Swiss-Prot record:
Annotated protein name in UniProt: KH domain-containing protein At3g08620
Cysteine-cysteine disulfides: none
Taxonomy, superkingdom: Eukaryota
Keywords: Acetylation, Nucleus, Phosphoprotein, RNA-binding
Source species of the chain: Arabidopsis thaliana (Mouse-ear cress)
N-acetylserine: modified positions: 2
Modified-residue entries (Phosphoserine), positions: 261, 269
Amino acid sequence: MSGLYNYNNFSPSRAASPQIRTPSSDVDSQYISQLLAEHQKLGPFMQVLPICSRLLNQEIFRITGMMPNQGFTDFDRLRHRSPSPMASPNLMSNVSGGGLGGWNGLPPERIGGPHGMAMEWQGAPASPSSYPVKRILRLDLPVDTYPNFNFVGRLLGPRGNSLKRVEATTGCRVYIRGKGSIKDPEKEEKLKGKPGYEHLNEQLHILIEADLPIDIVDIKLRQAQEIIEELVKPVDESQDYIKRQQLRELALLNSNLRENSPGPSGSVSPFNSNAMKRPKTGR
């Protein structure tokens, strides 16, 4: 992250008004300045690192609560204000280039300051290129042209690992939507028309979602698109190395499962941890 964001050696303590301090308060002031600078750098990643953000905020409030009132000079750089606009309008498009609507950027995370005030760190302004924006790319799958091709299974891969690798590589979230996105046809039929499942009336498609700094969000979306298009591209079975690779991985996973029975099942895949498991279809 440090290679992408340059804060020009910013030190919040430079704006502090001159006053007499004890050595202890000087140390505290320097520490709170460092904490606030870290909070500034973490800003674009608060959505993906919520625990780090929360712990950092807790430490800021713990330290400021221990300092005397004259030690709040660093908080003079904090002021109560409305969230600032994040970036240009977000894009949602399909592979043919037709726009399907816009997404609003997320407001910056607000933190609680002394005396219960909602405050926002106002140090050196962040570069506009560091603002996170959310964008969605839709890929329609040619199910009419290839009715017998298992697009869903191909994208998911063994234990969902193929999809997890795409997400881990690109930093994007990938969702399977539309008719056939739910494994159980009877369950899918029951869910049709219910709130949140309107997509089941549409053709099978993929949504790629990126919530990243504006200077890299389009690059990551294109990267995910290229990987997925290659992954689900129907090819002759004699040249289908992806299928052979997935079958080989599945055999290894099953072999490892048998070796570890009756205890907890393991996996040779680095993407098989419980922390990475989540449903990809449905709502």
